[in-house]
């Protein structure tokens, strides 16, 4: 999304949505019909003021409509755009406007799907990545084979992670996690559904 100030500066933000793709259209509608009318043609001294305005005035609506997540994602996209706008106006990188350091930040290659996992890791390694996160949670034998092949190819000092994308139930997680222990994963992401009962997380 694009934000523009009265003095002609612009900023860009991203409103994130996972599947289905029509969810992005829904968030665009929330932006245009709910959030934008709250903020357009108003004077905000700071991005946080606009964030507070949008969050406060839509909270009850989000509760009543069951839209807490989508509404928060739209407001976050607006917040990003306004911070970007302020940085461009100040002619500063955003990290400097926020007072941050210019120290190097480690990154990892993500979104490595189960088909051709090793080849994707090898390609990303050539591009300069030194940490990798595989998608698993499709088929246990395939998952283990992919993790094993990548781990065997990688230098043991390099990081390898896996993301289940909430595909397992508790029994499956308890069965599969021991099978992954020997591969030195730095972390295992979303092994259960995010709304799983606390007792399941505690047992895991």
Residue ranges and their predicted role:
Residues 134, 140-204:
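Catalytic core of soluble alpha/beta enzymes
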Residues 103-116, 135-137, 163-170:
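Active-site mouth loops of central-metabolism enzymes
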Residues 123-137:
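Catalytic domains of carbohydrate-active enzymes, especially glycoside hydrolases
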Residues 101-107, 128-130, 155-158, 184-186:
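Short, well-ordered coil/turn segments that N-cap beta-strands
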Residues 4-89:
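Metal- or metallocofactor-binding catalytic centers and their adjacent structured scaffolds
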Residues 1, 8, 35, 78, ...:
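Conserved, mostly hydrophobic/aromatic
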């Amino acid at each position: 999304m694009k934000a523009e100030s009265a003095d002609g500066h612009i900023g860009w933000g991203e409103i994130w949505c996972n599947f289905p793709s029509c969810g992005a259209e829904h968030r665009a509608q929330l932006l245009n019909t709910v959030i934008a009318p709250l903020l357009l043609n108003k004077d905000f001294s700071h991005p946080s003021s606009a964030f507070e305005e949008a969050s406060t005035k839509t909270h009850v609506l989000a509760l009543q409509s069951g839209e807490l997540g989508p509404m928060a994602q739209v407001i976050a996209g607006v917040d990003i755009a306004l911070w970007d706008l302020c940085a461009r106006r100040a002619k500063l990188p955003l990290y400097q406007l926020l007072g941050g350091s210019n120290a190097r930040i480690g990154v990892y290659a993500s979104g490595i799907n189960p088909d051709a996992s090793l080849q994707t890791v090898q390609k990303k390694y050539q591009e300069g990545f030194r940490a990798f996160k595989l998608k698993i949670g499709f088929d246990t034998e395939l998952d283990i084979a992919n993790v094993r092949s990548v781990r065997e190819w990688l230098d043991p000092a390099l990081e390898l992670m896996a993301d289940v994308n909430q595909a397992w139930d508790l029994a499956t997680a308890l069965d599969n996690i021991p099978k992954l222990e020997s591969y030195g994963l730095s972390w295992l992401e979303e092994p259960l559904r995010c709304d799983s009962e606390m007792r399941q997380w505690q047992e895991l």
